[in-house]
Structure formats: structure tokens, C-alpha cells
UniProtKB/Swiss-Prot annotation:
Domain of life: Bacteria
InterPro entries per UniProt: Cell_wall_hydrolase_SleB (IPR011105), SleB_dom1 (IPR042047)
Induction / repression: Expression is sigma E-dependent.
Function statement: Probable spore cortex-lytic enzyme involved in the depolymerization of cortex peptidoglycan during germination.
Protein name: Cell wall hydrolase CwlJ
GO molecular function annotation: hydrolase activity
Amino acid sequence: MAVVRATSADVDLMARLLRAEAEGEGKQGMLLVGNVGINRLRANCSDFKGLRTIRQMIYQPHAFEAVTHGYFYQRARDSERALARRSINGERRWPAKFSLWYFRPQGDCPAQWYNQPFVARFKSHCFYQPTAETCENVYNTF
């Protein structure tokens, strides 16, 4: 059962995001990107207050670099749609289980990203989650 509302167009949009942001990280990496996106929708805190739809979350200004590149606009594949559905249905995996941010640095992961603590690295991406004081909803929305 979905933890956020999603149409088939939303599933396709999410699938395209997963591929464009993390195809090189494999299925696990794409699921982690999906976790961050769904967390942003569910948390309603920090930079993500007021997001209500997958479309809003993906096209939020400066949220995902992938939307500025042509690869994002290519058709989603069935395998990517399946991963998107798993994220939409609430499958959460460490280190993105409570993360709201990730990025791909040139070198080591900084201990903090915009004052939010580092959780772990998965392949090339560093994941960061808010403190409970900053965003308690991310810890109790599922």
C-alpha cells in the first residue's frame, strides 16, 4: 500500500528520477534516492514544508540536479517503475531510511551537510538526515 498518493504518471516521473540520479549506483542506489524523495514528502519540515505531491517534490527548485539534464526526460523502463513503486509503497533502506539529503562529492563525505549530520556513504553518494529537533516527522511518519 502506498505511503504517498501516486498516479501512474507520478510512478513514471519517480522512475525517471531514480534512473537519472542514481543509475550508476545500481538498484540499491536508486531505491535510496527514492527513500529520500518520499521522506521529503512525508516529513513536511525544513526545505520541504508544504510539498504534497511527487511532482512538487521532484520539481522543487534546486532539489534534484537530474531534472536539468536530458537523460531525465527519457522514457522510464519497467525495472525503474518497479523500483519507484517500492519507494512509493514505503520500502526504506539504510542509509536513506531517515535521510532528506544526499549528494555526490568529489572526495570524502563531509561530517555535516547544511548543518545536518552525515549518516553514511553508499557508493558515490553521501546521505544526511535531520536531527529530531530539526525534523521529528521524518522519524514518525511510517
